[in-house]
Amino acid sequence: MSSGKITQVIGPVVDVEFGSDAKLPEINNALIVYKDVNGLKTKITLEVALELGDGAVRTIAMESTDGLTRGLEVLDTGKAVSVPVGESTLGRVFNVLGDVIDGGEDFPADAERNPIHKKAPTFDELSTANEVLVTGIKVVDLLAPYLKGGKVGLFGGAGVGKTVLIQELIHNIAQEHGGISVFTGVGERTREGNDLYWEMKESGVIEKTAMVFGQMNEPPGARMRVALTGLTIAEYFRDVQGQDVLLFIDNIFRFTQAGSEVSALLGRMPSAVGYQPTLATEMGQLQERITSTKKGSVTSIQAIYVPADDYTDPAPATAFAHLDATTNLERRLTQMGIYPAVDPLASSSRAITPEIVGEEHYEVAMEVQRVLQRYKELQDIIAILGMDELSDDEKILVGRARRIQFFLSQNFHVAEQFTGQPGSYVPIDKTVHDFKEILEGKYDEVPEDAFRGVGPIEDVLAKAKSMGY
């Protein structure tokens, strides 16, 4: 183990000098420094980011640098940060370094560990599947279905329901799927992670789930690398055990944001909107590892914050290129009280083809989008001149469009405590059948309000009956 000394500490950036004759650590190697706090020795892990020349390196701290001073000895571990993998990770909660943070027993020193930095699978190892992953959420299954082994992005601004949607997907898919799930909290609220942990514990899903957190209060180094920690755990189940793994990441934007902070601290010249010049490379290195191979699959569902609802911002725009399906959440729909606030016209999926979803599903989805698009075009006329200026056919279309718009909303299991309404899981065949009947005009006489926040069409009729229809 070669050793050096700290020469400079600027927040989470630490410069270490090894001497011009010493063997320098490689980029991404983990370095260890011990600091003395009130007589207790505490270990801090640093990761090598740059070589400065003259035997010095610049590192990023994975933990708080409070208490570090110039002259402290730093040891090179000779390898990258390594985290526990395998069956023993299930039901446990980890930080970026693979340390247990759920209050349970620590992992033994000889436990199997893998480095968090790794090359993406080669071209000939990749596998593409065309099987739809049923979520039980009507708007998703009908208009932008997810693929098993695919990558999904949940896009939305602040407070439009990304985390609630990801929690409902965990509830629906993890319980139905029965396989292994990995949840990675990247730079989000600790409270949400805590709530999710206890909910999963109550439902029993935690026994098949590994959880990794690097939350808002962590240094940028931890927030930038924690996604790789979760991914490393998922990769082991895929490559070694041949499992189909679900990988949830909340939130990919925070990964980019942490990269931006680190980049500025390392002295790199910022690029567009102040982001790091290496934004596309960093995103590519993460996303190319989240993939399905001939051994097993990783289906990833990633929440992606959209700053100021601007989809042209470089962070969400860079993520778009890597996804098979996008679910776009729209603030305008939350203001109308439609939850989940998924924009049916902006959301997309490569699964919407007759070959994958079938002819009937494809035709119903296209017709639903056509009706909603026409309604959108007519809204200006309605706002200025009123409904009376529309033709009879247009009036019928508007009525159906409004019923469809409301019927795309749904009560969630994870929101039961707030809404007082039981959550609903709707099978995909039932979803297609119900929307087909609405398009055919079978429910033109049923009040619009009965379609709001319900599951299958039977719930609509029951609600209409209770309203005196």
Curated annotation (Swiss-Prot):
One Gene Ontology term, aspect cellular component: plasma membrane
Reactions the enzyme catalyzes: ATP + H2O + 4 H(+)(in) = ADP + phosphate + 5 H(+)(out)
Keywords annotated in UniProt: ATP synthesis, ATP-binding, Cell membrane, CF(1), Hydrogen ion transport, Ion transport, Membrane, Nucleotide-binding, Translocase, Transport
Lineage: Bacteria, Bacillati, Bacillota, Bacilli, Lactobacillales
Membrane topology, from the record: Peripheral membrane protein
Protein name, per record: ATP synthase subunit beta
Compartment(s): Cell membrane
Cited HAMAP family: ATP_synth_beta_bact
EC code: 7.1.2.2
Residues that bind ATP: G156, G157, A158, G159, V160, G161, K162, T163
Keyword Ion transport found: yes
